[in-house]
Amino acid sequence: MADPHSLASPSDPVGPDGTIVVVGASLAGLRAAEELRHERHGGPVIVVGDEPHAPYDRPPLSKQLLAGTWDEERVHHHAPDKLDTLGIEFRLGLRADSLDVSGRQVHLADGSSLDFDGLIIATGARARRLPGTDGVDGVFVLRTLDDCLALRSRLDQFGDAAGGDAARVVVIGAGFIGAEVAATCHGRGARVTVVEALETPLANVLGVEMGAACAGLHADNGVELRTGAGVAGIDAGADDPVTVTLTDGTVLPADVVVVGIGVTPATDWLEGSGLTVSDGVVCNESLFAAPRIVAAGDVARWWHRGLDQELRIEHWTNATESGPRAARNLLAGSAAATAYEPVPFFWSDQYGVKIQMVGRPDPSDDVVVVDGSVEERRLIALYRRGDRLSAALAFSRPRQLMGYRPLVEAGASFDDALALARS
């Protein structure tokens, strides 16, 4: 199928001295800005970020930093003195308020504006919150560095189960972030309950069989998992800091509640800009949203030519790959731009098990475990769609998984994948 989001008019290359503004100072924005300098762009590069912190890595927030095994400095991508050598101007703690596409201006929350010759939108996503929970003491989300530090500080007020003063933690949502938070809180000695609306966690991503395998990790480690129940309300308790009431009538007392029900693309500042926004900034196959404007990372919804579908991917690898590609395409112009066709890859660390996937399975795909077993929590599972290999999943088999990555990238037959498994 042809790209349904092709530009109405071409995007000329940005000149060597043109000003490029990057809105978003997380991983995709940082990698885009670095790539501009790597490509020897000589004009001003200005990165605007709404958080006050220098660019940092998000995966450790739900693991090492929350656990307390890392300090804050370890999550930053560069030491402060290294940032000064990049030749990039960072304007941090400053939100973009609006975009004037025709005038090529970004309007900022302090009343100032930035003129640009090229714009890279990398504003990422924001954690979804449950209605009515703003301001309820003890209720947290985990998306930003400040979110993590606030949650860790709360957990630091408690001991562990052995001492009898363990925190009672309720995690709402058994997706990858929720599961990682549950595992980390359990590792800190908390008594953890996970609440998931689906009957099988992650069934919409991994299918029922492998979703059930992920659910089993909670049971293996003594973490209570309640599935098939939504949240009816979260309130400040009379005798407990927080009470969580489920749709089945169950009431869960808690000291800490972590809401992990996904994210929404940070596109509110683009309202009225004229860009097409629909669960992200809608882009063509080479990440152009409009002439001289590209998007990257969690906020970009683009046409994946190889998979013949729109994608918006929230994983770390996509941020590291899409940021540089968007930067190169912006410099080259739309006529010389290269389609962005990554093979999706993600990982998650839970209870000492490393879960990795390459490809993009459909829940209806057939799944065959070709190495290890679900019971031992060490396995390779292959996903079949028709006669093709659509994805491969590993539990604590990182080296073996990499052998299947070229097959997934090539759209190999399932028989070829089985042949590799037997070799």
Predicted regions mapped to residue ranges:
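Mid-to-C-terminal Rossmann-like scaffold of FAD/NAD(P)H-dependent oxidoreductases
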Residues: 4, 8-10, 15-19, 25, ...
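FAD-site-proximal beta/loop scaffold in flavoenzymes
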Residues: 2, 137-162, 240-245, 250-325
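Beta1-alpha1 glycine-rich phosphate/pyrophosphate-binding loop at the start
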Residues: 3-89, 182-205
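FAD-binding core/adjacent interface of flavoenzyme oxidoreductases
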Residues: 1-21, 76-168, 245-247, 256-260, ...
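Residue-level detector of alpha-helix initiation sites
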Residues: 26-30, 52, 125-127, 146, ...
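Rossmann-like NAD(P)H-binding beta-loop-alpha module
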Residues: 150-206, 210
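C-terminal catalytic lobe of FAD-dependent flavoproteins
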Residues: 17-19, 242, 248-276, 351-423
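A Rossmann-like FAD-binding core segment of flavoenzymes
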Residues: 42-44, 84, 90-107, 114, ...
